[in-house]
Structures are given as structure tokens and as C-alpha cells.
Regions:
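Nuclease-adjacent, charged terminal/linker segments that flank catalytic cores
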Residues: 1-4
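Short alpha-helical elements
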Residues: 18-20, 24, 67-71, 105, ...
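Non-catalytic C-terminal interaction segments of nucleic acid-processing enzymes
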Residues: 119, 124-159
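Conserved catalytic cores of phosphodiester-cleaving nucleases, focusing on short active-site segments
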Residues: 42, 60-62, 67-75
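Active-site metal-binding core of divalent-cation-utilizing nuclease and nuclease-like domains
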Residues: 48-56, 63-65
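Acidic-basic catalytic patches of nuclease active cores, encompassing PD-(D/E)XK
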Residues: 7-51
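Loop/turn residues immediately N-terminal
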Residues: 56-58, 119-120
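Catalytic cores of nucleic-acid endonucleases
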Residues: 74-121
């Protein structure tokens, strides 16, 4: 109290919230966060984004200047001696999801939005990787469109 005034309501409620400082982004949640990262990136580009209401082969619909585009979102935290490897294939719908992976049909997907373990963002036309089930991202550096590493608050929290 100062001058008889209660100033408690002016305190920072976040700073006084128990447990909030223990919340840290972790790469193990990248797969869960990737669609939101993609939607945010497209929105920051001034494009409208939609999510499919029913299960679809794509994760996002994006209104681009040349029409609605279907975007499949992929992530990788698999770093090998040659660089980041990402699976760009899918499993056909089956009981137990045990079928072998198959490539996406480039007639059904227009773009792949890929986020690697460094949070580097790639936007790759589906026709460029058509027929492949996995790719080595270092061969696609010309498709890098950004980086979301700032979400990690200056450090990567592994595991």
C-alpha cells in the first residue's frame, strides 16, 4: 500500500503464478506443434489457413494467390551424419497402422511444410519430392523459408 491505495492489482500475475517458470518448450513435442507453426507461418505471410474437418491426406488448406493449396506438415528430430532426415511417406489406412509406407500422391498434396530439429522451416513443392518416402533435408536448402528457433527461448530443451 502506498498513500493508502491498494496496488496489488497492478502486480504481474504471470510472475506470481506458481509453476509457470518450469514450463519449457521441448523438441519431443515438435510433432504436436508443427501444424500450429505452419498455420502461424502462413498467417504471418498474409494467407488464410484452414484445417480439414474430416481426416484428409493433407493437414492444412492455404489460400494462396494462385488458389487453394493442400499442405502436408512433417517434422524430424532425426539427425544422422549426413544431416536431418525426414519421412515424407505415409502409411495406408489399415488396422494397427502396420502397412509399409508409400509416397504421397502429388495430385493430392501441393506442398510439404517441414520443420527440422533446429526448427528450420522448409516449404517444398510436392512434385519435387514425388515418389520418395524419406529425404535428406540438406539437399533441399533452397526451399528454406524461415526458422522458428525463437520459440525455444534461446535454448533447445532436449527430451
Amino acid at each position: 500500500m502506498r498513500l493508502g491505495l491498494d496496488l496489488a492489482h497492478l502486480e504481474n500475475p504471470i510472475a506470481n503464478s506458481p509453476g509457470l517458470i518450469d514450463v519449457k518448450p521441448r523438441l519431443r513435442y515438435l510433432r504436436d506443434a508443427a501444424t500450429s507453426i505452419a498455420a502461424s507461418w502462413f498467417s504471418l505471410c498474409g494467407l488464410s489457413v484452414g484445417l480439414p474437418v474430416e481426416p484428409a491426406v493433407y493437414d492444412l488448406l492455404v489460400a494462396m494467390p494462385d488458389g487453394i493449396k493442400r499442405v502436408q506438415v512433417k517434422t524430424t528430430t532425426c539427425y544422422a551424419k549426413d544431416g536431418w532426415t525426414v519421412v515424407v511417406g505415409r502409411r495406408p489406412y489399415s488396422v494397427g497402422n502396420r502397412e509399409r509406407r508409400v509416397p504421397y500422391d502429388p495430385e493430392l498434396i501441393d506442398w510439404f511444410f517441414i520443420v527440422d530439429g533446429n526448427l528450420t522451416i522448409y516449404l517444398i513443392p510436392s512434385r519435387v519430392i514425388a515418389g520418395r518416402i524419406s529425404i535428406l533435408l540438406r539437399t533441399y536448402t533452397k526451399y528454406i523459408v524461415g526458422n522458428a528457433a525463437g520459440l525455444m527461448a534461446g535454448q533447445l530443451a532436449v527430451a
